[in-house]
Design a protein with these regions (language model features):
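TRNA-recognition modules of translation machinery and tRNA-sensing kinases, especially anticodon-binding
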Residues: 2-378
Length: 378
């Protein structure tokens, strides 16, 4: 149905950009997510499904795709491949233990791309353009791209101190999560779901004002390539993303649809130049993004987009007698082997009911078998 139609379009966009499909396991060692995604991210502190297997190993159902792809990249020594960078895309189910609400499910189908082995700002722009083109391919009109830069480690460390200084006087007015974040990871306070709209947040220092020269120049180059690719975007300094591994470019694509509620971010991503090394691989830069299929379907529904789904079949083969049924069995198989989408009768209905069934299946052609003709080999 419509989900398959969307998946096919997503795959087509990725293949056009020369990305290869990768499949990773549904569960991994828990340590992968605690190290890769970060101890302070919501996903790890509150949202993972963890279990201990029979060998007493701590395992986690994957809450996101990047860490598993990077683990596979390291284990399979893809960094040694001559054709760099390695450009991959994936889709599959992710699991998050959170309160189910519109646009947020505990089991979700997620799709994403990862590029490993290039620090070129052009790759940042390419990944953002893939996201935008996917949404355009399914017909979404109302989308907005928000971009930001978290800079390099030096810029972030500097900004971190500024944030701690700024937020400390307001500690009693913060939600419990933000109180914990203040020392551990103050950037995450800007991502707060509770106090996000408060004046304290709106007046907080902006990271774009604290980027060092190298980080600022890099961010300007990303914007230059987005302009060359004719992609509309807004620089939004409050975009920090919920995972701890990002640096430099981060972005979100939101749905500008009436009645979409608070879960209006369709997809998001960014650059993670330190993640491969953090997971015991070589120092290899990376960039990626992910999107939930459920939210995309919701946006398509809200925009009243009709996907062109072909639910017809090429031919329906009808019969009544046992002799006709035997012939139908071989005929249906032969047609299928020649590339046709074919069905036949399986419940012993009469011809009148079979006509109705063919109609329900939107069959383009009918073949009605007749004992007399079969005897005469007609």
């Amino acid at each position: 149905g419509s989900e398959m139609c969307i998946r096919d379009r997503i795959d087509a966009v990725c293949e056009r950009y020369n990305y290869e499909f990768i499949r990773t396991p549904i569960f991994e060692a828990s340590e992968l997510y605690h190290r890769g995604v970060g101890e302070t991210s919501d996903i790890v502190t509150k949202e993972t499904y963890d279990f201990t297997d029979r060998g007493e190993r701590k395992m986690t159902l994957r809450p996101e795709g990047t860490a598993g792809v990077v683990r596979s990249y390291i284990e399979n020594k893809m960094y040694g491949d001559a054709k760099q960078p390695i450009k991959l895309y994936y889709n599959g189910t992710m699991y998050r233990y959170e309160r189910p609400q519109s646009g947020r499910d505990r089991e979700l189908t997620q799709f994403g791309v990862e590029v490993l082995g290039s620090d070129d700002p052009m790759i940042d722009a390419e990944v953002i353009s893939i996201a935008v083109n996917i949404y355009k391919m399914v017909g979404l009109k109302g989308i907005k791209v928000n971009i930001n830069s978290l800079g390099d480690k030096e810029s972030r460390d500097n900004y971190r101190k500024i944030l701690i200084e700024y937020f400390t006087p307001y500690i009693n007015e913060m939600c419990d999560d933000c109180k914990n974040r203040l020392e551990k990871n103050p950037l995450r306070i800007l991502d707060c779901k509770v106090d996000g709209d408060s004046d304290i947040m709106k007046k907080a220092p902006k990271i774009t004002d604290y980027l060092n020269d190298a980080s600022r120049e890099r961010f300007e180059r990303v914007q230059k390539y987005l302009d060359l690719l004719d992609i509309d975007y807004v620089v939004n300094p409050s975009i920090v993303r919920g995972l701890d591994y990002y640096d430099h470019t981060v972005f979100e694509v939101e749905a500008m649809v009436e009645g979409f509620g608070s879960q209006n971010v369709l997809g998001a991503g960014g650059r993670y130049n330190g993640l491969v090394k953090e997971l015991d691989g070589p120092s290899v830069p990376g960039m990626g993004f992910a999107m939930g299929l459920g939210r995309l379907m919701l946006a398509i529904e809200k925009e009243n987009i009709e996907l062109p789904i072909d639910d017809s079949i090429d031919c329906f083969v009808m019969y009544v007698s046992d002799t006709e049924k035997d012939y139908a069995t071989t005929l249906v198989q032969e047609l299928r082997m020649n590339g046709y989408k074919v069905d036949t009768e399986y419940t012993g209905r009469g011809l009148k009911a079979q006509f109705k069934q063919a109609d329900r299946l939107n069959s383009k052609f009918l073949i009605i078998l007749n004992d007399e003709d079969l005897k005469n080999n007609e």
